[in-house]
C-alpha cells in the first residue's frame, strides 16, 4: 500500500520528548500504510525553540540545551531509520515575529533556530540522513523573519511553498 509522500499529524510534540512519543508515531505510520520504501520526514523542534529551550536552561547555556535537545531527537530519528524507513528531517523554519508568550524575541529565536538546525545537520550528516531546511531563506538581513512567509504565529504562508517545493525536489519520484 504505502503512502510515498503524505502528511501524518501526531499532535504537537517536541524534539526533546519525541522518543517518548514513538508509540504514537509508529501507530500513525502503520495506520497510513507507510512502508520501508516511503520517505518519513520528522518535523520537530519549532516548539522546543519557541517555548522550551530558553525557558528551561537550569544553569546551562542555550547552545548546551540545543545540543541536548538535538541529541535526544536523534534517538527518534535513528530508531525510525533502524526500523528500515527512508528517514529525512524537515528542520524547524524561522520563527514567527508574532509569537506571544514565546522565549525572547524573533531575532533570538531565529539565532536559536539556526544553531539548532546547524547541529541537527551535523548529526544527521554523520548518519547519512537528509535534512530539508528553509530557515535561512526566510530570515531577513536584520535577523527577523520575512513576514511574507508567515500566515500567523505558527504556520507558513503559501509564499513559503516554492521554498519547500524546491527543498523537497530531491525526493520526488
Could you say what each language-model-derived stretch is?
Residues 1-72:
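Conserved SGNH/GDSL esterase-like catalytic core that processes O-acyl groups on lipids
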Residues 49-63, 96-105, 145-149:
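Surface-exposed, active-site-proximal loop segments in enzymatic domains
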Residues 66-70, 74, 158-169:
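Short, amphipathic alpha-helical "lid/cap" segments that border enzyme active or binding sites
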Residues 97-134, 154, 158-161:
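Substrate-gating cap/lid alpha-helix
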Residues 70-78, 117, 121:
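Generic structural signal for well-ordered alpha-helices
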Residues 45-48, 77-111, 136-137:
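Active-site segments of SGNH/GDSL-like serine hydrolases
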Amino acid at each position: 500500500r504505502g503512502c510515498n509522500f503524505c502528511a501524518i499529524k501526531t499532535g504537537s510534540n517536541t524534539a526533546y520528548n519525541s522518543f517518548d512519543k514513538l508509540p504514537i508515531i509508529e501507530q500513525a505510520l502503520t495506520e497510513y500504510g507507510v512502508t520501508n520504501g516511503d520517505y518519513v520526514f520528522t518535523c520537530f523542534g519549532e516548539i522546543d525553540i519557541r517555548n522550551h529551550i530558553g525557558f528551561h536552561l537550569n544553569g546551562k547555556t542555550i547552545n548546551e540545551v540545543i545540543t541536548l535537545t538535538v541529541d535526544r531527537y536523534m534517538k527518534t530519528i535513528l530508531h525510525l531509520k533502524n526500523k528500515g524507513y527512508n528517514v529525512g528531517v524537515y528542520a524547524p523554519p524561522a520563527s514567527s515575529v508574532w509569537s506571544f508568550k514565546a522565549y525572547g524575541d524573533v531575532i533570538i529565536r531565529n539565532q536559536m533556530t539556526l544553531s539548532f538546525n546547524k547541529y541537527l545537520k551535523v548529526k544527521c550528516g554523520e548518519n547519512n540522513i537528509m535534512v530539508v531546511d528553509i530557515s535561512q531563506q526566510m530570515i531577513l538581513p536584520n535577523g527577523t523573519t520575512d513576514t511574507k512567509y508567515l500566515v500567523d504565529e505558527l504556520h507558513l504562508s503559501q509564499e513559503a511553498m516554492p521554498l519547500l517545493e524546491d527543498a523537497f525536489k530531491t525526493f520526488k519520484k
